[in-house]
Amino acid sequence: MAKVESFTLDHTAVKAPYVRLITRETGTKGDVISNFDLRLVQPNENAIPTAGLHTIEHLLAGYLRDEMSGVIDCSPFGCRTGFHLITWDEQSTEEVAKALKASLHRIAYDTEWKDVQGTDKYSCGNYRDHSLFSAKEWCKAILDEGISKDPFTREVI
């Protein structure tokens, strides 16, 4: 079986919340994609409940695109501690951390239920599993800790 980089990361050594570049790859036509680890809570110490995480996912899908160019996808980790962010080109972890911070701030302080996209049976495969209250509370807690541009040393932006 192929080795997956995310499973070789020492999850006991990282200090969440942080942004980490997992990989940067160049396609056969020269296009560059980057995969970032947006770790919101400390692995094996916490996990965001699915309803809150699901709502954060839907909001990040739009807000990150408002904050930075080149967003392809932002998908939650199965362990519920953060997200993969896939982008075109070569953004720095600091650029991504700033976009993430701004997006989480919008969720925590500016978002109302009407702002959450994809919350009906036609636009979401699990539309009943959302909580804006949970999303806001988790985002406030994450922002209070500060988002680091480095996974191993706290370099809060």
Swiss-Prot record:
- In short, the EC number is 4.4.1.21
Species this chain originates from = Levilactobacillus brevis (strain ATCC 367 / BCRC 12310 / CIP 105137 / JCM 1170 / LMG 11437 / NCIMB 947 / NCTC 947) (Lactobacillus brevis)
Origin: domain of life: Bacteria
User: Which amino acid positions bind Fe cation, per UniProt?
Assistant: 54, 58, 124
| Name of the coding gene | luxS
Assembly and partners are described as: Homodimer.
State the Gene Ontology BP annotations.
quorum sensing
Q: Identify which cofactors the protein needs according to its UniProt entry.
A: Fe cation
| Protein name listed in UniProt | S-ribosylhomocysteine lyase
HAMAP family in alphabetical order? LuxS (MF_00091)
User: Keywords, A to Z?
Assistant: Autoinducer synthesis, Iron, Lyase, Metal-binding, Quorum sensing
Q: What is one Pfam family matched by this protein? A: LuxS
Q: Which reaction does it catalyse?
A: S-(5-deoxy-D-ribos-5-yl)-L-homocysteine = (S)-4,5-dihydroxypentane-2,3-dione + L-homocysteine
Q: Which GO terms describe its molecular function?
A: iron ion binding; S-ribosylhomocysteine lyase activity
Q: Does the keyword Metal-binding apply?
A: yes
- Explain the purpose of this protein: Involved in the synthesis of autoinducer 2 (AI-2) which is secreted by bacteria and is used to communicate both the cell density and the metabolic potential of the environment. The regulation of gene expression in response to changes in cell density is called quorum sensing. Catalyzes the transformation of S-ribosylhomocysteine (RHC) to homocysteine (HC) and 4,5-dihydroxy-2,3-pentadione (DPD).
Cross-referenced InterPro entries, in alphabetical order? Answer: LuxS_sf (IPR037005), Metalloenz_LuxS/M16 (IPR011249), S-ribosylhomocysteinase (IPR003815)
Q: Which family, according to the similarity comment?
A: Belongs to the LuxS family.
**What binding details are noted for the cofactor?**
Binds 1 Fe cation per subunit.
